[in-house]
């Protein structure tokens, strides 16, 4: 459990009290910040949080594509985390992420989907690939952040960002048995050579052979084992049509 807040949209007295109560419960805090030019024209959330002494290692900022150099410095100084959603950055023309700069400053970063409503899917292979490409465009340097670093952002750094790296995020004795096995002899990934390059720049969900979560096999030989995919799709379609009918829209 965590808390999602939006200082800048709510009165200072309200969000300060909210954060005080949430921190009293020991819960992590997530906060959208610097997503769009329109937002920073109204207020700069990161600067607001910094001046209110609210930033810290228990805070995860989402986006920050339009954070100023000074604001990125504030994040580094306070050890505030940053989760970057590259699909949102490109789909909404929000801006190019400052991934390379944030990593150089020592900011704990990770990758995220944000919302499938905006991004269209939750394919982490595509998210890794897009993040790498957007960073190339931002830095104009294809060597600044490379495939292995992107893979870390999607795995162990995601766990670190969420404060659960002691349980998941890497293949380590004592951690949960979370595994994704990718075929390396499929046409689009063969011949196998560089694991990080293969996963970040070539692999697709189709190439996933087996998925094990906390020791439970959820996918095997390319087939889902824990649910009936056809049933899920059918129920989702029924729910969608019912919602459209209630809203009075076309379906």
Where are these regions (language model features)?
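Histidine/acidic residue-rich metal-binding segments in metalloenzymes
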Residues: 1-81, 93-109, 166
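Short, acidic/turn-prone active-site loops that include or flank metal/cofactor-
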Residues: 35, 86-91, 114-117
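His/Asp/Glu-enriched, well-ordered alpha-helical/loop segment
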Residues: 51-58, 100-186, 202-204
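Short, charged, surface-exposed secondary-structure boundary motifs
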Residues: 92-97, 120-122, 191
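Active-site microenvironment of metallo-dependent hydrolases
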Residues: 154-251
């Amino acid at each position: 459990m965590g808390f999602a807040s939006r200082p800048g949209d709510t009165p200072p007295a309200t969000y300060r009290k909210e954060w005080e109560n949430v921190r009293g419960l020991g819960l992590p805090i997530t906060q959208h910040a610097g997503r769009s030019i329109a937002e920073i024209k109204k207020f700069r959330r990161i600067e607001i949080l910094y001046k209110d002494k609210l930033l810290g290692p228990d805070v995860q900022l989402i986006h920050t594509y339009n954070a100023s150099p000074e604001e990125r410095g504030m994040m580094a100084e306070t050890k505030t985390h940053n989760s970057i959603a590259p699909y949102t950055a490109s789909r909404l023309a929000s801006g190019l992420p400052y991934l390379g700069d944030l990593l150089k400053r020592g900011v704990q970063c990770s990758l995220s989907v944000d919302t499938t409503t905006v991004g269209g899917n939750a394919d982490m292979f595509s998210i890794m690939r897009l993040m790498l490409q957007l960073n190339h465009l931002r830095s104009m340097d294809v060597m600044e952040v490379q495939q292995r670093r992107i893979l870390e952002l999607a795995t162990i750094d995601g766990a670190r960002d969420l404060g659960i790296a002691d349980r998941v995020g890497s293949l380590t004795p004592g951690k949960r048995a979370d595994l994704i096995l990718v075929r390396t002899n499929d046409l689009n990934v063969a011949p196998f050579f560089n694991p990080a390059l293969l996963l970040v720049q070539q692999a697709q969900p189709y190439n996933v052979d087996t998925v094990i979560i906390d020791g439970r096999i959820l996918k095997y030989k390319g087939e889902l084992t824990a649910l009936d995919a056809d049933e899920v799709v059918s129920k989702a379609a029924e729910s969608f049509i019912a919602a459209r009918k209630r809203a009075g829209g076309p379906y």
